[in-house]
A protein has these predicted regions:
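N-terminal Rossmann NAD(P)H-binding glycine-rich loop of SDR-like oxidoreductase domains
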Residues: 23-36
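Rossmann-fold cofactor-recognition segment
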Residues: 47-61
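Conserved NAD(P)H cofactor-binding loop of Rossmann-fold oxidoreductase domains
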Residues: 77-86
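Catalytic loop of short-chain dehydrogenase/reductase
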Residues: 99-100, 108-109, 123-149, 153-158, ...
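Active-site-adjacent segment of SDR/Rossmann-fold oxidoreductases
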Residues: 117, 134, 155-164, 207
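C-terminal helical subdomain
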Residues: 161-164, 168-216
Length: 216
């Protein structure tokens, strides 16, 4: 079920309803993003296990099926993507590949397959993370994926047509994940969920493109 509201946003035709796909909208960060955006927008939640539409971003066929089912849309925000978390000393190439295939290529796939379908002046907002700038030993796979996403966003922004924008949100350690990941991040304060969700809102409702919006 979608959630409907109204919007007055100069990035689109003012006063029109903005339809936003939130991939990973049932996850920790995605839930906060959906809660914030659904007050003013028509939000469609897409996820691998739950949501309005099922999608596995590591599968081209699944992403194409998602777009066919949803139809027209004005923005896509992704808060999904897996990567291996574990000691670098024992990491295998298969474990490293998880982050490349899911978090990195999965998000790029959303853009490549959706760029011709999104409304004019629409936007893509991907997710990377602080671990690219401030890595921890257990998250090498995350750092690799995050770096690739940042590079893609900056490069793609130069060539996207029809005034379509693209940005990435780089969240810090989310408040709702602190209990799980806090021990691996000594001295790092958790970031409130609203602050992270608001970074997605800035990307979608603003004018910027090719930027990494840091929420940490």
């Amino acid at each position: 079920m979608t959630r409907r509201g109204t919007v007055a946003d100069d990035s689109f035709e003012g006063g029109t309803l903005v339809r936003i796909i939130v991939v990973g909208g049932a996850g920790t960060i995605g839930t906060a993003v959906v809660e914030l955006l659904s007050a003013r927008h028509d939000v469609v939640v897409a996820g691998r296990r739950s949501g309005d539409v099922r999608v596995d971003i590591s599968s081209r066929d699944s992403v194409q099926s998602m777009y066919r089912r949803i139809g027209s849309f004005d923005a896509l925000a992704c808060a999904a993507g897996e990567a291996h978390f574990g000691p670098f000393e024992t990491m295998t190439d298969e474990e490293l590949e998880l982050g490349v295939q899911s978090k990195l290529l999965g998000q790029l796939r959303l853009v490549l397959l959706g760029r011709s379908l999104i409304s004019e002046a629409g936007s893509f907002t991907l997710i990377c993370g602080y671990i690219f700038d401030d890595p921890i030993p257990e998250a090498t796979s995350f750092a690799v994926a995050n770096g690739g996403i940042e590079g893609f966003v900056r490069a793609a922004a130069l060539r996207l047509e029809r005034r379509v924008r693209i940005n990435a949100v780089s969240p810090g350690m989310a408040q709702d994940s602190y209990e799980q990941f806090g021990p691996f991040n000594p001295g790092r304060a958790p970031v409130p969920m609203l602050e992270i969700a608001s970074a997605f809102e800035r990307s979608i409702e603003g004018w910027r493109t090719g930027e990494i919006i840091r929420a940490w």
